């Protein structure tokens, strides 16, 4: 007997924003309904908001297309951010020296579940 799937997931990997900054946005939508989460993301003035919104819409699309779940019944059940690979660069400094610049990336994962 086939088990009824009630959740869908979407992931964005190696996004060029530090995980610490993305977590500030992701913490706002965890546990909210999809409609409420999209409204919050639309009016949150942070650089990570459009990226998180895109991942959320992808998770909703996965739920609708792959598992025939209804958009109005979906809730953001799980949302987390992990650190991705760090791009290491160097900035020239005085007297011929250089200092390291770490360009941090992150992996964003959002899971939506039916109420």
Curated annotation (Swiss-Prot):
It holds the Pfam family Ribosomal_L22. PROSITE patterns: RIBOSOMAL_L22. One of its GO terms (biological process) is translation. GO terms for molecular function: rRNA binding; structural constituent of ribosome. Keywords: Ribonucleoprotein, Ribosomal protein, RNA-binding, rRNA-binding. The keyword RNA-binding applies. It comes from the Bacteria. One of its GO terms (cellular component) is cytosolic large ribosomal subunit. PANTHER family: CHLOROPLAST 50S RIBOSOMAL PROTEIN L22-RELATED (PTHR13501), LARGE RIBOSOMAL SUBUNIT PROTEIN UL22M (PTHR13501:SF8). Part of the 50S ribosomal subunit. This protein binds specifically to 23S rRNA; its binding is stimulated by other ribosomal proteins, e.g. L4, L17, and L20. It is important during the early stages of 50S assembly. It makes multiple contacts with different domains of the 23S rRNA in the assembled 50S subunit and ribosome. Belongs to the universal ribosomal protein uL22 family. This is Large ribosomal subunit protein uL22. It comes from Lactiplantibacillus plantarum (strain ATCC BAA-793 / NCIMB 8826 / WCFS1) (Lactobacillus plantarum).
């Amino acid at each position: 007997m086939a088990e009824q799937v009630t959740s869908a997931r979407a992931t964005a990997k190696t996004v060029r924003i530090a995980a610490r900054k993305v977590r500030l946005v992701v913490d706002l939508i965890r546990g909210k309904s999809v409609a409420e989460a999209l409204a919050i993301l639309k009016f949150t003035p942070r650089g990570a908001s459009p990226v998180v919104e895109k991942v959320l819409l992808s998770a909703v699309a996965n739920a609708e297309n792959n598992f025939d779940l209804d958009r109005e019944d979906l809730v953001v059940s799980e949302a987390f951010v992990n650190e991705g690979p760090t791009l290491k660069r160097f900035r020239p400094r005085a007297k011929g020296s250089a200092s390291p610049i770490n360009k941090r990336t992150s992996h964003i994962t959002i899971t939506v579940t039916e109420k």
